[in-house]
Amino acid sequence: MKKHLIIFFFILTHNLLLAQKSNCSANDLIERLEYTKAIELLTQCIDVTSKNTEGMLQLANCYYYTSKTEEAEKYYKLAYEAIKDKATHFNYIDCLRSNKKYDEANAAMKKFALKYSSDSRSTTFLKKDNATEALLNQQKKYTVKKININSDRSDFGGFLLDSTFYFVSSRIEQNKKYGWNEEPYLDIFFSIRKNDTVFSQPIPLKELNSSFHEGPISITKNGKNIYFASESFTVNQFDKIKNKKLKSGQVQLFTATNDHGVWIYAKPLPFNSKLYSVSNPSVNSTNTTLYFSSNMPGGIGGNDIWKVTINGDGTYGKPENLGPKINTEGDESFPFIDENNLLYFASNGRPGLGGLDVYKIDLKN
């Protein structure tokens, strides 16, 4: 899952006349987040000999958003001098890191830091310009093993409650395909853990799954409440873009109650919005604080880690940003809070090895 990046789309315009027709169609596909189909169109008129640097960058971004970092790097390099914006510049650096070209990534990051000196990623890099070497040479603390229920599709977002293991997967081939990567829509599954690597055959969590994306999830320690991500379309909350014949929705958070092993009364959380996404929930062991990722106003970067108080009467406080100790001008996501108040999260805004790296911080300090 290292290469399954969670990033907002970026669209380049002002294409050259030769690619005007194809690029116009590609723009429509990109606006619908259908990057795989956009690549098919763009590669018909863009190649390594092309003079259309803006089209090259558009193709590079499509490859980047679909985790094809080697292809993305090739086109970023060819059109490097034409990069005008910070996001695309950092995408290129991230590709180099993901492709293990750390010296090139550091050289590109130095140029980024000179151009965008106030960016938190620049200041952190200049303070820790040997961070990559330190990461590569650090002693391994964990042993990673594959378990027997992985598929050839995306499987992630694992959550273990007693012996029941919940996770998110796009393995149901009958589901409609998501245009971003042409994989089936995500569903929530559960499996019974038999030992460290052997789990029972996964079963879809039908009472929460819909025809849209579901997951990841988090469950309270007593097993009574579940928090899960889904799409705003499930509650008919979206904007219509009539001239494009599009419907624009968001990822939102929902909660449900366990009634004799069945999840019932699913309802949206009150801080959901049509204007921003809220996802990746993690509830603490006392069921008093919910952590999540969001691009809501008031943040520092793209996606930030936030928290909200869960009151005793079931209401919620006002979401609070966790601030610059955790969040950067990049993306922070997938928070997980453990019983000792250690927060684990993923970030691409710090010196790392490419894509989303895992970090932890003790929230007691």
Please give the residue ranges for each predicted region.
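Bacterial Sec-dependent N-terminal signal peptides
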Residues: 1-26
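Start-of-helix register in tetratricopeptide repeats
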Residues: 20, 54, 87-88
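Alpha-helical segment of the N-proximal tetratricopeptide repeat
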Residues: 20-44, 48-49
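Short coil turns that delineate tetratricopeptide repeat
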Residues: 50, 83-84, 117
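Short, conserved micro-motifs composed of acidic
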Residues: 91, 98, 102, 111-365
